[in-house]
Amino acid sequence: MKHIISPLDLSLSELSDVLNLAEKIIVDPKQYSECCQGKKLATLFYEPSTRTRLSFEAAMLNLGGSVLGFSSADSSSAAKGESVADTIRVISSYADICAMRHPKEGAPLVASTYSSIPVINAGDGGHNHPTQTLTDLLTIKNLKGRLDNLTIGFCGDLKFGRTVHSLINAMVRYEGIKFVLISPEELKIPAYLREEVLDRGNIPYEEVKNLEAVMPELDILYMTRVQKERFFNEEDYIRLKDSFILDAKKMEGAKEDMLVLHPLPRVNEIATEIDNDPRAVYFKQAEFGVYARMALIMLLLNVVPQE
């Protein structure tokens, strides 16, 4: 049995399996509509979510399975003090696979040690978000045609942005990748990521504070919001929330085939005037999240149809 707590829990070969299957689903989703008949997905969401929770539910329903779970800690026995370990022990007897989101880093890892069913990390604090990474990789692969030889800019909250941390961990395994890290000083990527992943792996990167200046070199621009829920001091949030805003003027300097990604939700970091630019693919990215999760669920449950 395999748990997906980090993108690194999938080898490059396994990543390829997920992405290739997801692309087949994009072409003909109805072919897989009965793969999970009789199977149940438990969604244990201790933290608010729109896209991740609903796309997991849509994925399982599209596969012919069913879903049970909760959408906030307050609506579960966590509000009474029940531990993650006890919760997952019980849920393991109710479902065949589990997706967990939790505000505490490492909670899904704890759950996996007590679970008798596969656990998928649907986001743990500011740490990891592996299924968003699969969504991002699928979007890039499908729309750019490759996952190597890319210059990728990450802009905004790189300190608390778990989607950024996960995608960096995944992309460093491909050839010819360069990162441009665009953030205010207070929201730079964590030191462990810089030292243990980028520096140790000799991955080329630059840290800058001016988005417009680096736009011409980017193949991918990954925008993020400044996350109010990660700040202890509201004054710091207010001071930093408008640090980087992507608008039509900044897009003038970008390549014609650059892609703008965003894990969503956005607040004001991408002007709505960008939405109709063909390079803005964040809504397509959200759609691809369903297909990526369908593929992962099928592979973890070993229900992929034989060709």
Curated annotation (Swiss-Prot):
Its recorded reaction(s) are: carbamoyl phosphate + L-aspartate = N-carbamoyl-L-aspartate + phosphate + H(+)
Binding sites annotated in the UniProt record for L-aspartate: 80, 162, 225
The Swiss-Prot or TrEMBL record annotates one GO molecular function as: aspartate carbamoyltransferase activity
Query: E.C. number, please?
Result: 2.1.3.2
Q: Name one Pfam family in it.
A: OTCace_N
Q: In which pathway does it act?
A: Pyrimidine metabolism; UMP biosynthesis via de novo pathway; (S)-dihydroorotate from bicarbonate: step 2/3
A single Gene Ontology biological process assigned to it is: 'de novo' UMP biosynthetic process
Q: Which domain of life is it from?
A: Bacteria
Q: Does the keyword Transmembrane helix apply?
A: no
Quaternary structure, per UniProt, is:
Heterododecamer (2C3:3R2) of six catalytic PyrB chains organized as two trimers (C3), and six regulatory PyrI chains organized as three dimers (R2).
What function is annotated for this protein? Catalyzes the condensation of carbamoyl phosphate and aspartate to form carbamoyl aspartate and inorganic phosphate, the committed step in the de novo pyrimidine nucleotide biosynthesis pathway.
Q: Which family does it belong to?
A: Belongs to the aspartate/ornithine carbamoyltransferase superfamily. ATCase family.
Name of the protein this chain belongs to: Aspartate carbamoyltransferase catalytic subunit
Tell me the classification of the organism that encodes this protein.
Bacteria, Bacillati, Bacillota, Clostridia, Lachnospirales
